[in-house]
């Protein structure tokens, strides 16, 4: 079918046709376009708008196209888009009666519907992958409830924690990413079909029926908004950008922890590379590429917002340029989930090195201050000053945390406050021991092994409820 034959006197210039065609990325909505056309055709027949026998022919042709696949379409740029390519296929199969398929429908509401149908499935796929990843992280955390390591602030030793506790931080952030996607899905799952070009149609169509046929939760209440809204795309790509950031943070820590200086983990060979000149090298290339690809996903979001920012209502062809950025973001993040999951679940943990670092640089100092407060009723700020001075003196004296005892603490307290603390030596030793330090933090959300197990149990319950 020549769409231009009525209003225009010539075909589009070849380069202009290629420049404006969306066919290079319309394969993402091929299945959705068939589904949309089928639902609309069934509705037209149900409402008596087109003959039932014509509708049957159209649906048979669409079924044949679904079986043959997108390769059956003429994808020449002059066709413009997937909608016309599909219509041309049906026309070639059944003749001019194929034109009934477009009754009361515009490419404006059709593409908006296709995008929502296709994106709905992509979000569900990503969500399933994300739940699986969170589940796997939770399992890994259970294996490391007593793998003591140092936690960092400002990338400086801060306080002892466990790898299990740290892994559940990953799981918690990814759970929020999952929840954001579920919330966005509510706004994606709205039916624009029936809005036509922008003001619906004079044909007595049934929007409730197409909404049911396409499995949408509801239809959109304003036809102008329905054909021009792409905020659901921007919202989705923001969610994906945030998810990519969290995956990038995991990747960054794997890069750091696998260095000789940290030496906490070894990344699997399957997710590493080597150097073309330095034979000793084992490089965390997968983690580095994941980190870099996060920026490309963020770039897709910025581009989408830039395209949308000044468009008058309703439809503008500019909106066509939004969709490739959506699909690139979707494909990139889905790939990131899979490779980061494989990398993280395959790490080999050096428990001895992790424990060594936890006890090497006074990461237990906070608990020593807490014990002073509890045992002697001293304000925390005074205890903070005592322990801060103790750390400075110990470093100057070349002492490790394990070398500090209650006598040494009394010397420092005398210097700072003019009086000794005279704490039980066992209390001081316990406060400075990384494992004991962790075990004392039996607060919900904390690193004590039993608290991590509770966190895992709660996460598992959440995952189970979401999978139902």
Curated annotation (Swiss-Prot):
Gene Ontology MF annotations: argininosuccinate lyase activity
UniProt record, GO biological process: arginine biosynthetic process via ornithine; L-arginine biosynthetic process
Pfam families cross-referenced by the UniProt entry: ASL_C2 (PF14698), Lyase_1 (PF00206)
Pathway the protein takes part in: Amino-acid biosynthesis; L-arginine biosynthesis; L-arginine from L-ornithine and carbamoyl phosphate: step 3/3
Cysteines paired by S-S bonds: none
PANTHER family on file: ARGININOSUCCINATE LYASE
NCBIfam families to which the protein is assigned, alphabetical: argH
Organism (species): Methanothermobacter thermautotrophicus (strain ATCC 29096 / DSM 1053 / JCM 10044 / NBRC 100330 / Delta H)
Catalytic activity: 2-(N(omega)-L-arginino)succinate = fumarate + L-arginine
GO cellular component, one term: cytosol
Annotated localization: Cytoplasm
Cytoplasm among keywords: yes
EC number of this enzyme: 4.3.2.1
Name of the encoding gene: argH
Family: Belongs to the lyase 1 family. Argininosuccinate lyase subfamily.
Keyword Cytoplasm set for record: yes
Main location group: cytoplasm
High-level lineage: Archaea, Methanobacteriati, Methanobacteriota, Methanomada group, Methanobacteria
HAMAP family named among the record's database cross-references: Arg_succ_lyase
Superkingdom of source: Archaea
Identification of the protein by name: Argininosuccinate lyase
């Amino acid at each position: 079918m020549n769409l231009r034959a009525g209003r225009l006197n010539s075909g589009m210039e070849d380069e202009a046709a290629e420049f404006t065609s969306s066919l290079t990325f319309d394969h993402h909505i091929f299945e959705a376009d068939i589904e949309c056309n089928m639902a609309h055709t069934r509705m037209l027949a149900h409402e008596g708008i087109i003959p039932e026998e014509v509708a049957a022919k159209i649906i048979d042709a669409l079924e044949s196209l679904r079986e043959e696949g997108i390769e059956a379409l003429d994808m020449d740029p002059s066709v413009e888009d997937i909608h016309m390519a599909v219509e041309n296929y049906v026309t070639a199969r059944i003749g001019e009666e194929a034109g009934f398929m477009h009754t009361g429908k515009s490419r404006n509401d059709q593409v908006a519907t296709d995008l929502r149908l296709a994106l709905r499935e992509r979000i569900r796929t990503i969500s399933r992958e994300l739940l699986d990843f969170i589940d796997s992280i939770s399992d890994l955390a259970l294996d490391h409830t007593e793998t003591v390591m140092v936690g960092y602030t400002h990338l400086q030793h801060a306080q002892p924690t466990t790898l299990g506790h740290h892994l559940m931080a990953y799981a918690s952030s990814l759970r929020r990413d999952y929840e954001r996607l579920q919330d966005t899905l509510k706004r994606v799952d709205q039916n624009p079909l029936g809005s036509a070009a922008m003001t619906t149609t004079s044909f007595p169509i049934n929007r409730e029926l197409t909404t049911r046929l396409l499995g949408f939760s509801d239809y959109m209440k304003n036809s102008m908004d329905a054909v021009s809204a792409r905020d659901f795309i921007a919202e989705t790509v923001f969610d994906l950008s945030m998810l990519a950031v969290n995956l990038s943070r995991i990747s960054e820590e794997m890069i750091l922890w696998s260095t000789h200086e940290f030496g906490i983990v070894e990344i699997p060979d399957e997710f590493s590379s080597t150097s073309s000149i330095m034979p000793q090298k084992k490089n965390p290339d997968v983690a580095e590429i994941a980190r870099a690809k996060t920026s490309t996903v963020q770039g897709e979001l910025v581009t989408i917002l830039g395209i949308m920012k000044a468009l008058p209502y309703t439809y503008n062809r500019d909106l066509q340029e939004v969709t490739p950025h959506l699909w690139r973001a979707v494909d990139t993040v889905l790939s990131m989930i899979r490779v980061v999951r494989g990398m993280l679940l395959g790490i080999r943990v050096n428990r001895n090195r992790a424990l060594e670092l936890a006890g090497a640089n006074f990461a237990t100092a906070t608990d020593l201050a807490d014990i002073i407060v509890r045992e002697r009723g001293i304000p925390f700020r005074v205890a903070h000053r005592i322990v801060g001075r103790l750390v400075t003196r110990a470093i100057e004296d070349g002492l490790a945390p394990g070398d500090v005892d209650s006598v040494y603490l009394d010397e420092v307290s005398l210097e700072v406050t003019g009086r000794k603390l005279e704490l039980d030596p066992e209390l001081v030793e316990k406060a400075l021991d990384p494992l004991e330090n962790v075990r004392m933090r039996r607060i919900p959300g904390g690193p004590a092994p039993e608290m991590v197990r509770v966190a895992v149990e709660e996460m598992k319950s959440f995952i189970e409820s979401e999978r139902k």
